[in-house]
């Protein structure tokens, strides 16, 4: 109750989620699989001995980048490799994965004729938009600037003027023009954004929000969805999140943690902010102690905690709604009491004076 924007009749816009999954395997995408295998083995070898600072400064940025794009992953490895000891095999397999993806981009027309020849995140997403979301207004978010730069170029090549973008790498004035074009031009169907696109923008004209990558901070997900789920939106038009993620991976754990545990893609976070810091700490702890299954184990506990918090919030919202609804009555009653007291005091004054 009271967790979605509503119209004058009190109706709420619905939220929905659609999973778009792909497999990382030796048979389907060899070098992506090798890159993930090397990264996972390196993390597992440190399990139980990782410090909080190592997770925050090294492991978390690498995992976030890996499950975004090979461009972002290679960039993070290059940055961190200057400061920390990262195994040569981790770096080598990342380079090969990037080369493979760039080869696919150079031959994209052939790849799209047979997507099973290179079923990567990028190829699956292009195919899904072309086949399932044709003609829809779409906002696409990524937290990685390298992913934005790569996808923006590829999408412009594939979809032409239907695509525009907003990011820190685009001139500010040009980015504002791009936002306006997306909002006002019916032929502009896709807006690709980096994390700066999730701040204070009204994108309620869009039908879908696509998450190219999954942030570790759940408030970022809420910000993305909130660009579409705003006051004034047609409540008959649901806000649908399309989440593309790999299966049998840490990314799938994170998706289920957010979706099954907190239902964030279908329900607002309103009132749950108080437990967000604890949740973020649990994610980091899962990497330190049980990278392969830790988040799965936390989901039942998270569901109970979230349900308890939502019940509390609902009770408070009912109280607040009642307070707002009956405030005019309270004011009228207060005025009545003041008037009656004044009359009573006046009558006492008259009686005392003439007795």
PLM features per residue range, with description:
Residues 11-28, 57, 61-190, 327-330, ...:
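Conserved Helicase C-terminal RecA-like lobe
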Residues 1-4, 39-42, 46, 65, ...:
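Phosphate/oxyanion-binding loops and surfaces in catalytic or ligand/nucleic-acid-binding neighborhoods
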Residues 50-54, 58, 139, 201, ...:
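Short, surface-exposed helix-loop/turn micro-motifs enriched in polar/charged residues
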């Amino acid at each position: 109750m009271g967790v979605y924007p509503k119209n004058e009749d009190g109706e709420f816009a619905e939220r929905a989620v659609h999973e778009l999954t792909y497999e990382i395997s030796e048979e389907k995408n060899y070098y992506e699989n090798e890159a993930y295998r090397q990264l996972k083995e390196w993390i597992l070898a440190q399990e139980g001995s990782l410090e909080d600072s190592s997770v925050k400064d090294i492991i978390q940025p690498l995992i976030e980048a890996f499950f975004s794009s090979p461009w972002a992953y290679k960039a993070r490895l290059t940055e961190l490799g200057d400061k920390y000891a990262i195994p040569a095999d981790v770096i080598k397999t990342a380079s090969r994965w990037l080369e493979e993806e760039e080869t696919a981009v150079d031959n994209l027309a052939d790849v799209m004729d047979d997507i099973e020849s290179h079923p990567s995140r990028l190829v699956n997403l292009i195919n899904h938009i072309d086949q399932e979301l044709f003609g829809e207004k779409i906002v696409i978010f990524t937290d990685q600037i390298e992913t934005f730069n790569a996808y923006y170029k590829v999408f412009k090549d594939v979809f032409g003027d239907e695509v525009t973008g907003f990011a820190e790498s685009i001139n500010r004035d040009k980015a504002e023009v791009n936002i306006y074009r997306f909002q006002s031009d019916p032929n502009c169907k896709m807006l690709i954004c980096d994390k700066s696109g999730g701040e204070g923008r009204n994108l309620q004209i869009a039908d879908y929000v696509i998450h190219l990558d999954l942030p570790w901070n759940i408030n970022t997900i809420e910000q993305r969805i909130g660009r579409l789920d705003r006051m004034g939106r047609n409540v008959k038009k649901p806000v649908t999140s399309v989440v593309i993620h790999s299966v049998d991976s840490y990314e799938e754990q994170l998706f289920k943690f957010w979706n099954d545990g907190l239902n964030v893609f279908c329900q607002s976070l309103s009132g749950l902010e108080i437990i967000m810091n604890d949740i973020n700490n649990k994610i980091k702890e899962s990497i330190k102690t049980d990278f392969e299954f830790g988040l799965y184990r936390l989901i039942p506990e998270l569901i109970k905690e979230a349900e308890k918090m939502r019940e509390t919030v609902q009770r408070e919202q009912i109280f607040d709604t009642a307070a707002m609804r009956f405030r005019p009555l309270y004011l009228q009653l207060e005025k009545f009491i003041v008037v009656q007291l004044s009359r009573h005091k006046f009558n006492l004054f008259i009686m005392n004076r003439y007795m």
